[in-house]
Amino acid sequence: MMTVSATAEGPAGTKAATGRVVRVIGPVVDAEFPRDAMPDLFNAMHVDVTLSGGEKTLTLEVAQHLGDNLVRAISMQPTDGLVRGVEVRDTGSPITVPVGDTVKGHVFNAIGECLNLEPGETLSPDDHWQIHRKAPAFADLEPKTEMLETGIKVIDLLAPYVKGGKIGLFGGAGVGKTVLIQEMITRVARNFGGTSVFAGVGERTREGNDLIAEMTESGVIDKTALVYGQMDEPPGTRLRVALSALTMAEYFRDVQKQEVLLFIDNIFRFTQAGSEVSTLLGRMPSAVGYQPTLADEMGELQERITSVRGQAITSLQAIYVPADDYTDPAPATTFAHLDATTNLERSISDKGIYPAVDPLASSSRILAPEFVGQEHFTVATEVKRILQRYKDLQDIIAILGIEELSEEDKLTVGRARRIERFLSQNTYAAEQFTGMKGSTVPIKETIDAFKKISEGEYDHFPEQAFFMCGGLEDLERKAKELMAEG
């Protein structure tokens, strides 16, 4: 036997409108309200359901007005046990999440419930903010061009990240997006010293648990808030979890005037959840089955991730590329909003080179002399030229063999192979798997090393010496060891 109750009290004790559920189809719930008390779009609604296992409160978000006093809402939790005729109450506002210093070190779901409170522990947040907010006014925006040094050679040299910018990590399944984003959390949170917010959007629960354990072990969790809506959650939760995390980040930026790091893994799942919700609401699909509002939804999220005067949100977003197809509307729509792209390539990971960054496809808007300096730009351009020439020659090598190349091209191929291997690097996030300690290489050392390699100073070093090493000192040590053995 199931009994259901609903109170008539809204937030702050005000009288809330109550309605009645008239239809339930999976996560889609239709409710009828009095004509003069219709809830607004995006308002949160609550319904209390008592099951044999105890009572639970479902949160619904109004998505459509159907006419005839009916609203259609998307549930943020499974609707098991919800039946027609149950009373539902309008809270009078959109979903809100806790904000402030008390959220650091805690894990939340999309509706702001804390998931890792100890027995007897309570959370006293500074405030609650609505997750649907306007982007900062144009007059308040402040473009940033300062480089965010990561200590990862391939990124710092060829696709440098922007402080206060939006960075995309593109790649298909299993090429290392989550490992790289975990690596960036460890590196940047340690060196950056600011506040971090992590949004787990539609990814594996195991990865979420691993991330919490790693952050606790490395000591960065006390400066981080985590918001999870994993792949076993309803589409409504996966669609809103990024907004919930972004709202927490905006509070640190706008009220506490802090520099904030926002990590989103995975932005494709945000798009995917939007597609599911769009289908559930009966909208006509657009290209490749995506929602017709894809560009609008992506823009609403990305336009809020920005720099305002004095402080910024720096965002790293993992972006799954379906079937490695970069023309798919989901990754293609995201490209336009990014300041830097790091493309992870399966053919590079197949060679055992990690991080498996494609040096020719990755890009950054600040890789220009006026932003990174003339020497950095010149070295990066020369490295790309050598790698591009090697790529152009690969068909000839495959058919005729390397012996048929000119002496100049043979030299180029040798240097390209050394550069390709030197772009690999041991990471802190993979230490437990590889047993090899991660390395951080300052940008000046990175530029100096690649300048010497591209000019031929290390042509006599064996190629294997360049593989998975840190800076110049590490390279020279490995080369001496290998030459002594040989």
Swiss-Prot record:
MF annotations from Gene Ontology: ATP binding; ATP hydrolysis activity; proton-transporting ATP synthase activity, rotational mechanism
Task: Give the Enzyme Commission number.
Answer: 7.1.2.2
CDD domains, sorted: ATP-synt_F1_beta_C (cd18110), ATP-synt_F1_beta_N (cd18115), F1-ATPase_beta_CD (cd01133)
Q: Tell me yes or no: is Disulfide bond among this UniProt entry's keywords.
A: no
Localization in the cell? Cell membrane
Q: Name one GO cellular component term.
A: proton-transporting ATP synthase complex
Membrane topology field: Peripheral membrane protein
Enzyme group, top EC level? Answer: translocase
Cited InterPro entries: AAA+_ATPase, ATP-synt_VA_C, ATP_synth_F1_bsu, ATPase_a/bsu_AS, ATPase_alpha/beta_chains, ATPase_F1/V1/A1_a/bsu_N, ATPase_F1/V1/A1_a/bsu_N_sf, ATPase_F1/V1/A1_a/bsu_nucl-bd
Task: Output the Gene3D superfamilies linked to this UniProt entry.
Answer: 2.40.10.170, Bovine Mitochondrial F1-atpase, Atp Synthase Beta Chain, Chain D, domain 3, P-loop containing nucleotide triphosphate hydrolases
Q: Does the keyword Transport apply?
A: yes
NCBIfam families noted in UniProt: atpD (TIGR01039)
State how it assembles.
Answer: F-type ATPases have 2 components, CF(1) - the catalytic core - and CF(0) - the membrane proton channel. CF(1) has five subunits: alpha(3), beta(3), gamma(1), delta(1), epsilon(1). CF(0) has three main subunits: a(1), b(2) and c(9-12). The alpha and beta chains form an alternating ring which encloses part of the gamma chain. CF(1) is attached to CF(0) by a central stalk formed by the gamma and epsilon chains, while a peripheral stalk is formed by the delta and b chains.
**Sequence similarity:** Belongs to the ATPase alpha/beta chains family.
Role summary: Produces ATP from ADP in the presence of a proton gradient across the membrane. The catalytic sites are hosted primarily by the beta subunits.
Task: Specify the protein name.
Answer: ATP synthase subunit beta
Give the organism, scientific name. Salinispora tropica (strain ATCC BAA-916 / DSM 44818 / JCM 13857 / NBRC 105044 / CNB-440)
